[in-house]
Amino acid sequence: MRGTVAFYSSIAQYRKYYAAQGFGAQADAVIAAAARKDTAAMLKAVPDEMVTTFAVAGTPDEVRERVAKLWQCADSMTLSPPQYFVAPARFNEYRTALVETLYQAA
């Protein structure tokens, strides 16, 4: 999910949103790295705390638990696998894991 957070925080229009959540400096670093087309620096500029603030990641049990907590305050969610800066084969693995974790009956 680091790549997804990096992608969205690289968009200047979202900078105020990230700043309001306490991640303005990190968003600035990602925006600067994106301008240089430095993907590695973009990913490095996103700390773990930023990933966990804006995305759900972890083991299947951790993801289910976190999503269940989010449903307590959300009336809708869009859940998608990591897709930015991820190899296509890896994206397919993540997509399968997401379906198996959240959408298949136990």
Features from the language model and the residues they span:
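Active-site-adjacent structural elements that line small-molecule/cofactor binding pockets in enzymes
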Residues: 1-106
